[in-house]
Amino acid sequence: MAWSSAGFDRWVARSARMGATAGVTMFAAAAMLAGCSKSESPSTTAAPVTKIKVGFSIATLNNAFFVGLKNGVERGAEKQGFDLVQTNANGDAQQQVNDTLNLLSQGVQAIVLNPIDSKAIIPAVEKANSMNVPVFMLDRGSDGGKVTSFVASDNVALGAAGAKWIADQLTKRYGSPKGNVVDLIGLIGTTAATDREKGFSDEIAKYPDIKVVARQEGGFDQEKSLNAMTSILQKYPQIDAVFGANDDNTVGAEKAIDNAGRYKPLGDPGHIMVIGADGTAQALSAIRAGKQDATISQNPIGMSAKAMTFITDYETKKDVPANYAWPTYLIDKSNIDSDGAKQYGLWALEVKQ
């Protein structure tokens, strides 16, 4: 048989076409398999984590206790992973309402309030209620609206403890609970002042020979308490003890006692006993110096950090207490360096103001 180059060329061309078709078919099949494999594999891209946005309105930062509250809220928010937005009302009740409404307009998912005035704050609480934003109260409460959780010391018990301490000290001095006492009330309009006054008044009334010779508002303020105590000292030559609703009240009272030349050291029969509340650095220094006898310490850092855990509990559908009483600790010269004081009372050493 004769060999034909033309026939060979036709065979090569036909083979090339068949090979190309097979290659296209195999590539298409591979692509289909790859597509199936990709669609059936789970996505490895993590969804972005959305932080809970929390608004916090504090009454003031004019004393160490409130600085402690702020520090605790910040620590708690960081630990819980919150996006925290803060405002300071600087002692202005209407400003605090406006601040709270502004926080709500920013889309916060929870609001923490430390009210200046328990009545003035009601519209802000009710607005949060209407928006289904849970309200958490810190140290001071509201007289209206729905509050999810109120975290504070038991201020009625705190006031009663102050009265009981005075009665015990007067018994040691005179053999029975008797003497003249001054009551410097806190900032009128706050639940803390109202409750402490109730606790103190109810307890001190159990001792008929203890006379409350003066009750005046100290306003949780050193200058106001200084002025109030100055007037009281001018009117009453015999005063045995002073109850200050917080340590700013007592610091003001101590200055007035000094200015009047009425200071006598611990153990002297003329010593005017002074007890306050909060456990501020000034109070601790005054206790060491013998100017103040005692303070009922409440730890605002721990208190406010605890409140932040309740926001997490609420958001994760766990039970949240309507009221949570933060523990207090009475500090005097005998226990100021004790382990108990270090654990429960010396929060002020962590605060810079």
Regions found by a protein language model. Give the residues of each.
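Sec-dependent bacterial lipoprotein signal peptides
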Residues: 2-34
